[in-house]
Design a protein with these regions (language model features):
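Surface-exposed amphipathic alpha-helices with a cationic face
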Residues: 47-55, 105, 125-129
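Short secondary-structure boundary segments
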Residues: 65, 89, 121, 139-142, ...
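A short, structured active-site edge motif that brings together acidic residues
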Residues: 80-95
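Short acidic capping loops at alpha-helix termini that bridge into adjacent secondary structure
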Residues: 19-20, 81-84, 112-116
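Conserved Lys-Pro-Asp/Glu-containing loop-to-beta segment of HAD-superfamily phosphomonoesterases
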Residues: 95-125
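Acidic, Mg2+-coordinating phosphoryl-transfer loop and its flanking beta/alpha structural elements
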Residues: 116-156
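N-terminal helical cap/lid subdomain that shapes the substrate entry/recognition surface
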Residues: 1-48, 54-56, 67-72
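Glycine-rich phosphate-binding loop signature in dinucleotide/nucleotide-binding domains
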Residues: 55-58, 108-114, 171
């Protein structure tokens, strides 16, 4: 969930302000762009969840802090058809700012009161809550926040994708 910054920090103990970080980050991102789909797979239960959402006539989208150059090839690789995609470089701000969620809702003419936003990082929940969207913390994924998921102030915590289908909105 912390992207290249988090991976480089964990692997090499290097931070963005350190000498050599920019070069290392560029090399990493170039490599990632070439190989990101090599071992990529959707989390267990996600394909079925998306099929069920679509079968119900609902729409779903992707709102990520990952840049478009990485997002769109993965969407194509996994043969996904989201109604909307908002990447980290789509707007001038990214999560935890709520604006990417508001932008996505506006793009598909949807209301916050009728939406659910699920995420595996506290930034996701902060963005959803800021956009007044029902927030769901998922217990699968990267869970990059140092805070326990129970402390994220989510409207709901789920343990597997199938639980998302039964959500009744309360916001």
């Amino acid at each position: 969930s912390s992207g290249a910054r988090g991976l480089l920090g964990a692997a090499f103990g290097i931070r963005p302000e350190d000498a050599g970080y920019a070069e290392m980050a560029k090399e990493f991102l170039d490599y990632y762009e070439e190989h990101m789909a090599d071992h990529s797979r959707l989390f267990d239960g996600v394909p079925e969840m998306l099929q069920d959402i679509e079968a119900q006539g609902a729409r779903w989208g992707i709102i990520t802090n990952k840049h478009a150059r990485f997002v769109h090839p993965l969407i194509k690789f996994h043969m996904l058809e989201p109604a909307v995609v908002v990447c980290g470089d789509t707007l001038k701000v990214s999560k935890p700012n709520p604006e990417p969620i508001r932008f996505a809702l506006k793009s598909i003419n949807a209301k916050a009161s009728e939406a659910i936003y699920a995420g595996d990082d506290k930034r996701d929940i902060d963005a959803a809550n800021g956009a007044d969207v029902f927030s769901v913390a998922v217990q699968w994924g990267y869970l990059g926040s140092p805070q326990p998921v129970q402390d994220w102030c989510a409207d709901l915590i789920v343990h597997n994708p199938s639980e998302i289908l039964g959500i009744e909105l309360t916001k």
